[in-house]
Amino acid sequence: MSSSALRIGTRASRLALWQAEWVQQQLETLHPGLSVVLVPITTKGDKILDVPLAKVGGKGLFVKEIEEALYDGSIDLAVHSMKDVPSVLPPGLILPCIPPREDPRDALVTPDGRSFAQLPQGARIGTSALRRQAQLLHRRPDLDIVSLRGNVETRLRKMEEEDMDGIVLAAAGLKRLELAERIAEYLSVDVSLPAIGQGALGLECREGDDRTLELIAPLHDADTAVAVRAERAFLRRLNGGCQVPLAAHATVAEQTLTMVGLVAEVDGGSLIKETLAAPVAQAEAVGCQLAETLLARGADRILAALDITPTPLVP
């Protein structure tokens, strides 16, 4: 095996660097003598911070520039948050390794430690995701949802500076940054179903790069990968992205995959939710079937109102 350094491309935020450094440490421990270097890359999503993601448009806002670095050979491996990765990869790139998942739940952070049930009438809640907005408003139509962009530290600061009653973030990011003590409440998946791939990392490389594939193989977690594959099949069928309030979460136990999915109106007025279970070997079929069930129950109308056309099923 070549002794040249393995170059990991990553976004430059503190959380993204933590994730890439975790992979770096794992690889250097697994392969003594291997040099792993990080290559921070600024993405379009990092540059545009004054516009809600749903209005920026497009997919891959936090990965495209990193994938371009894979294409041109300036990096060997990309470390992504799986929830940022579009459901269809560019030709020639693969996601062969998904490590064990961190906590997939959303978390409520409040200045005074209040729980969701204790939030006052008309509370101002910050979030960047239509998915969260729709689910929170479905339960609490009185809430005033404030668009909130930026990295974890920026969002925590804005909560204080802009006098918000709370913000909703991914629990995984707070835990990885050792900020779990800021969490007032872990929101159950019944209250806020997570984003596709939330809490999971994705390691992306060039197809046929045998050296990189061999190096990262020990980090792969089969159960996490099966769950994420099902979630991404759901996302792919519904042609989802930042502009669509949809969510899905799959779990694996005793070779059975159980998956919950939903599609909602942005204002939370209508929310369609279903659960399916099947053997893990049928993971992608479960994701597609769950999407079909929601479409038949009215999700097609919600998507049409957002000018989103579901991806046709491949025979």
Swiss-Prot record:
EC numbers, comma separated: 2.5.1.61
A GO biological-process term: protoporphyrinogen IX biosynthetic process
Cofactor: dipyrromethane
Family listed: Belongs to the HMBS family.
NCBIfam families found in the cross-reference section: hemC (TIGR00212)
Purpose: Tetrapolymerization of the monopyrrole PBG into the hydroxymethylbilane pre-uroporphyrinogen in several discrete steps.
PANTHER family in alphabetical order: PORPHOBILINOGEN DEAMINASE
Stated name of the protein: Porphobilinogen deaminase
